[in-house]
Amino acid sequence: MAYSAEAYLYFPGGYGTLDELFEILTLVQTGKISRLPIILVGAAFWKPLDEFIKQTLLAEKGTISESDLDLYIITDDEDKIVEIVKNAPMRND
């Protein structure tokens, strides 16, 4: 799945969803796969995770860099999602 996608869309879910999300974030962050859109749909669901990433991983622990925050986008805007996916670059890895 990870190597054939041209964008990654995640909807609210459980441990499996979080596992897949962090696997893709890690692969992109470490340059093992091309950077492609990672879209988290459902702002109310994803906001606490986003706050944890910003406050704990970035600010308190320093285990990620500020540029890592640009690896994903959180939105509920369907038109924006369609536009991002339509304009996603083709894979080159």
Please annotate each region the language model reported.
Residues 3, 64-93:
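A charged, well-structured terminal subsegment
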Residues 1-71:
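Conserved phosphate- and dinucleotide-binding cores of soluble alpha/beta proteins
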